[in-house]
Amino acid sequence: MAKSPPRSGSRRPGRIGSRKSGRRIPKGVIHVQASFNNTIVTVTDVRGRVISWSSAGTCGFRGTRRGTPFAAQTAAGNAIRAVADQGMQRAEVMIKGPGLGRDAALRAIRRSGILLNFVRDVTPMPHNGCRPPKKRRV
């Protein structure tokens, strides 16, 4: 069966420019998710809408290098550079996960010049929930 031709006007016209860059954000929340394989840094406003994000993978690190502290530092610097231009002065930091990039990302955030209200560890800890997987035998 042949495809029908696309209808004109069925899609909305594309937005020119970014609507996120027009806002002034004086205060925000910086979420750092540090796993053993990667570190993801997300900057949101206080209502939780994403303003900027970066990860070690998007910064050009591949394979095992994504889990390194230097990769986390680079990812945090990239995410914060975008929001510093939008006027963010204060932030809260939420750190999640056991990865190596936790401290390096926090160091990069402190060096950026944004005042930190508090730093909170929000790593999920089970209250003896699900049974963990069996131990590996190598």
Curated annotation (Swiss-Prot):
Keywords: Chloroplast, Plastid, Ribonucleoprotein, Ribosomal protein, RNA-binding, rRNA-binding. Disulfide bonds: none annotated. Its main location: plastid. Residues 1-24 are annotated as: Disordered. GO terms for molecular function: rRNA binding; structural constituent of ribosome. It is found in: Plastid, Chloroplast. Coiled coil: none annotated. PANTHER family: 40S RIBOSOMAL PROTEIN S14/30S RIBOSOMAL PROTEIN S11. This is Small ribosomal subunit protein uS11c. It comes from Citrus sinensis.
